[in-house]
């Protein structure tokens, strides 16, 4: 476990202090119109991060909070539960995080806890990272194979081909192993999936045989 997250987890289990004021959350309340939308929260957070020049710091803050909350189900359920006194949850939240993350990040977490929406934090982080990638002109390409092919000649050729196709972006490759695809490769570029797996070919073959019978 990350040392920062470990320290926070330890504190979360024992510390209580006073409630965070509603005034500190007011900026988010004005920006965010749709409480159920992680995209809106992420956009509000990113706009503020951009304004204060802390895009990467807030990105790190969000991941620290997420990892420290979710590492223990009891802690996560404590902050998620609407049956636990809101003032108590806020007091603990302030004691643990107020001096460890930026005030802007803390305000977002406080709003999520106050509105019983901490369960969408991961979705907010994903959307925030997407906005970061867009800002830095980064595109993430996920490559899935049935076995480890990261350093092979075939993989290097595939990466070169993709890089030539998307020459106007800074490409960040991620690699995943999934034995269920049997062979071949599955490439994900943003929301588009290019499935060249053996599994897909077998599925199509099976479907074709069924239609002809």
Curated annotation (Swiss-Prot):
Compartment list: Cell inner membrane
Keyword Ubl conjugation found: no
Subunit description: F-type ATPases have 2 components, F(1) - the catalytic core - and F(0) - the membrane proton channel. F(1) has five subunits: alpha(3), beta(3), gamma(1), delta(1), epsilon(1). F(0) has three main subunits: a(1), b(2) and c(10-14). The alpha and beta chains form an alternating ring which encloses part of the gamma chain. F(1) is attached to F(0) by a central stalk formed by the gamma and epsilon chains, while a peripheral stalk is formed by the delta and b chains.
Alphabetical UniProt keywords: ATP synthesis, Cell inner membrane, Cell membrane, CF(1), Hydrogen ion transport, Ion transport, Membrane, Transport
GO CC annotation: plasma membrane; proton-transporting ATP synthase complex
UniProt similarity note: Belongs to the ATPase delta chain family.
Topology within the bilayer: Peripheral membrane protein
Task of the protein: F(1)F(0) ATP synthase produces ATP from ADP in the presence of a proton or sodium gradient. F-type ATPases consist of two structural domains, F(1) containing the extramembraneous catalytic core and F(0) containing the membrane proton channel, linked together by a central stalk and a peripheral stalk. During catalysis, ATP synthesis in the catalytic domain of F(1) is coupled via a rotary mechanism of the central stalk subunits to proton translocation. This protein is part of the stalk that links CF(0) to CF(1). It either transmits conformational changes from CF(0) to CF(1) or is implicated in proton conduction.
A single MF term (Gene Ontology): proton-transporting ATP synthase activity, rotational mechanism
NCBIfam families: ATP_synt_delta
PANTHER family: ATP SYNTHASE DELTA CHAIN
Annotated protein name in UniProt: ATP synthase subunit delta 2
Protein's UniProt keywords contain rRNA processing: no
């Amino acid at each position: 476990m990350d040392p920062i997250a470990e320290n926070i987890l330890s504190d979360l289990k024992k510390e209580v202090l006073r409630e965070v004021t509603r005034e500190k959350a007011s900026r988010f309340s004005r920006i965010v119109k749709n409480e159920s939308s992680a995209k809106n929260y992420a956009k509000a957070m990113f706009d503020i991060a951009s304004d204060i020049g802390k895009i990467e710091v807030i990105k790190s803050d969000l991941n620290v909070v997420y990892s420290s909350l979710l590492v223990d189900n009891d802690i996560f359920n404590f902050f998620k539960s609407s049956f636990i006194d809101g003032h108590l949850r806020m007091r603990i939240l302030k004691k643990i995080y107020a001096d460890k993350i930026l005030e802007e990040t803390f305000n977002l977490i406080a709003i999520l806890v106050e509105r019983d929406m901490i369960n969408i934090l991961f979705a907010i982080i994903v959307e925030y990272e997407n906005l970061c990638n867009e800002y830095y002109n980064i595109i993430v390409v996920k490559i899935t194979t049935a076995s480890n092919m990261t350093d092979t000649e075939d993989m290097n050729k595939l990466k070169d081909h993709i890089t030539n196709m998307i020459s106007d972006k800074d490409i960040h490759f991620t690699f995943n192993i999934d034995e269920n695809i049997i062979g071949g490769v599955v490439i994900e570029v943003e929301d588009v999936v290019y499935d060249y797996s053996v599994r897909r070919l077998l599925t199509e073959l099976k479907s074709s045989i069924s239609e002809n019978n």
